[in-house]
Amino acid sequence: FKGNPVSLEDSSGSQGYLQDASFSTTDDTGGGGVDFASGTEALLVGVFNGAFFVDNTTNKPTFANSVAAAQRFGTNPNTNSTDGIGFVNDDPHQEYIIKADAAVTRAAHGQCGNVNDFTATDAKNGQSTITLDVGALAEDHMFRIVRSAEDPENEDLTAAGANVVVAFNSSANLYLK
């Protein structure tokens, strides 16, 4: 996953493993993606920004901005572990740019939305393809719409595909709650 919201494996945070919260079902069997609700899911810790691991095919240390779910990590000769290290942008006040899946009305500004469910077939050479689900805004969702990103190529808020700036909803982020 690349640029996707990330939470800890369980709602207590005791596991310490990252999970992709943009999938419809997360590793802790909670809802993710469009089903995320801050009152019932593991709270978000940030946005995935790459991983370091030993490539299982080449046995070489590797950094990748995106990691497919099918990726198998090789054994690290220094630690004898097959774990990778995930890097997460965890500043709870960080703003992000995301494409909207529908028109963003004036009334939608300040509202909260989730990302649409991501599937493996959506992968585009390591680039994020997630979109903000504008059709189902609710106060317990992941991201709050802040403003238009003012991207000259994608700033028509009356059409799907406009870039908008979002920030974590304080009730959905582990560090803002």
What are these regions (language model features)?
Residues 1-177:
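Surface-exposed, low-hydrophobicity beta-strand/loop segments enriched in small/polar/acidic residues
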